[in-house]
């Protein structure tokens, strides 16, 4: 059976692993998932994201989660644009999360980036998720 929303699956795996205190989490590889994980790393929500070569030439992404005083750094991880309802925003309407304390991850024509980088680049795109 095929998965309908692999990005939502990735986000749920990260959220569930963080809520029970796991040090890391693995999920199947895709270029979009890796780009999202690298944005999370760059923004300081996770320690590391790396590609692990698995059996039968299938790769996984391993994310090392980050905790502060025993609590997960990622408090909110919400999928916005989904397969049944896509959410697109122009450069003027890019959403801010918690008044700028969190980030929106946007898929643009220039790649996957945060809402602030999309504003700097002057591009809009599909709002993939909110992180805080």
From Swiss-Prot:
Superkingdom per UniProt: Bacteria
GO BP annotation list: translation
UniProt keyword Ribonucleoprotein, yes or no: yes
Keywords: Ribonucleoprotein, Ribosomal protein, RNA-binding, rRNA-binding
Classification via SUPFAM superfamilies: Ribosomal protein S8
GO molecular function term, any single one: rRNA binding
GO cellular component: ribonucleoprotein complex; ribosome
Family per record: Belongs to the universal ribosomal protein uS8 family.
Quaternary assembly: Part of the 30S ribosomal subunit. Contacts proteins S5 and S12.
Stored HAMAP family: Ribosomal_uS8_B
Function: One of the primary rRNA binding proteins, it binds directly to 16S rRNA central domain where it helps coordinate assembly of the platform of the 30S subunit.
Identification of the protein by name: Small ribosomal subunit protein uS8
